[in-house]
Swiss-Prot record:
InterPro entries the UniProt entry points to: Puta_zinc/iron-chelating_dom, UPF0153_domain
Family classification: Belongs to the UPF0153 family.
Protein name stated in the entry: UPF0153 protein PA1578.1
Coiled-coil features, chain-numbered ranges: none
């Protein structure tokens, strides 16, 4: 599966424990990454300072669903399940 252009759910819904430029403590779940632009594209994509965890994430129908809204909901659900 290819990422949907303009989605950005993986840059909003999950927590990221790794430090990011401008977010040294990482990113809490449900908080928009500082590097997500107005078109929901990653400003760090392809740059060496992009966290490895972001580069390792791959689009998957079970996580991304059929729409941006579904992806946000599914990733938020995974956050709850994996936080327990």
């Amino acid at each position: 599966m290819q990422c949907r252009a303009g989605c950005g759910a993986c840059c909003i819904a999950p927590s990221i424990s790794s430090p990011l430029p401008g977010m040294p403590a990482g990113k809490p779940a449900g908080v928009r990454c500082l590097h997500l632009d107005e078109n929901h594209l990653c400003g760090l994509f392809g740059r060496p300072e992009r966290p490895a965890v972001c580069g390792q994430f791959g689009a998957d129908p079970e996580i991304c669903g059929d729409s941006r809204e579904q992806a946000l909901a599914l990733i938020a659900e995974w956050e709850v399940i994996t936080a327990a």
